[in-house]
Amino acid sequence: MSMFEDVTRALARQLNPRGDLTPLDSLIDFKRFHPFCLVLRKRKSTLFWGARYVRTDYTLLDVLEPGSSPSDPTLLGNFSFKNMLDVRVEGDVEVPTMMKVKGTVGLSQSSTLEVQMLSVAPTALENLHMERKLSADHPFLKEMREYKQNLYVVMEVVKAKQEVTLKRASNAISKFSLNLPSLGLQGSVNHKEAVTIPKGCVLAYRVRQLIIYGKDEWGIPYICTDNMPTFNPLCVLQRQGSTVQMISGEMHEDFKTLKKEVQQETQEVEKLSPVGRSSLLTSLSHLLGKKKELQDLEQMLEGALDKGHEVTLEALPKDVLLLKDAMDAILYFLGALTELSEEQLKILVKSLENKVLPVQLKLVESILEQNFLQDKEDVFPLRPDLLSSLGEEDQILTEALVGLSGLEVQRSGPQYTWNPDTCHNLCALYAGLSLLHLLSRDS
């Protein structure tokens, strides 16, 4: 992960813990995430480990009929952050035979980041909605309609108030130093990084979905379900004054919802033939620990789905094609796996070889089930049976796997320290383990 991503993710956590503020991934794209910019949501995004959006070259104003410009976004507040990337420094902790936990010392940030939060005012949106109709024949809208793409409008942004150069130096790759040569996680690297963030750079943002109905009517609902498409002439919208709102039931985000979501996606993968599942496992096994290649595969599948192309993976027989629902499900799990660190991905490869994925899945499921809505850091007991069946090496692998998500497991007790900031990463780990467990059951 780049330093810019570290900064934007840390900023989003500080301003809106476990909320819907999305950190910007790429510095070069910041001009395409200003208020009223149109963006695409990556396929199979989920709020459980963070939705991701892709830039377009258009704004909402570009696809409306000509008319008056909306008023400037409203300033919601100014904020200042210093040493945002500093982490807690821990002393060396010896764990039996094969693992040493080290604090990531030497990480520093020498500058103060000053930001401001800006939002499109409700009155500005209402006036725009009343005064300007949709340009129904706009080529961009025609293309998006043809490929059934959902469009989202940037409604709120966090911007840098001044140009700032952030620096850091680190003397370790990760928190864990495992004495397992096959994982390639030993050793440390001394490196320095710096990133210059220009004045006005968007660092994080909030979006709302654009809904298009009729020939030239549009709306930006306050509430919108995932299965509501942007282009839907049959959708029912209610007007309250000049505000368009979607009729929608209340959504509950808890562990049961995550579990149901993951089960639905695994069911689609399960529909593959045994040969297809085995070949998919082979392909993923070669890519785990190679995060860039996983991301490339994700982009390739997204592009194929957008254009309606058939897809085969390298390890799949030529007659085993991935149908759309299976590709959607694989994209969902790729999104989860790419949220994990390369160290975690390498540990998953070893865990797969050692056949300990079922235990690891139960452990993560138990922790999330107990603490999903817990918003304070605390120490909780761990069921002894969750780790007692593992040998020494497998227990260390499992502790490191969840530890790299930010969850500290202590054998004394046993117990673990829950940190709400780790929830998103643990959700991604839960989904990744669910897929690999399913695929490895036949092997």
Swiss-Prot record:
Cleavage relieves autoinhibition by releasing the N-terminal moiety (Gasdermin-A2, N-terminal) that initiates pyroptosis. In contrast to Gsdma, not cleaved by bacterial effector protein SpeB. Keywords: Cell membrane, Coiled coil, Cytoplasm, Lipoprotein, Membrane, Necrosis, Palmitate, Transmembrane, Transmembrane beta strand. The chain crosses the membrane at residues 78-95, 99-120, 164-179, 183-197. InterPro entries: Gasdermin, Gasdermin_pore, Gasdermin_PUB. GO terms for biological process: programmed cell death. A cardiolipin binds at residues 9-13. Residues 249-312 form a coiled coil. Disruption phenotype: Mice lacking Gsdma, Gsdma2 and Gsdma3 are highly susceptible to subcutaneous group A Streptococcus (GAS) infection in an animal model. Residues 1-249 are annotated as: Triggers pyroptosis. Expressed in the gastrointestinal tract, specifically from the middle to the upper region of the gastric mucosa in the glandular stomach. One of its GO terms (cellular component) is cytosol. Belongs to the gasdermin family. Intramolecular interactions between N- and C-terminal domains are important for autoinhibition in the absence of activation signal. The intrinsic pyroptosis-inducing activity is carried by the N-terminal domain. This is Gasdermin-A2.
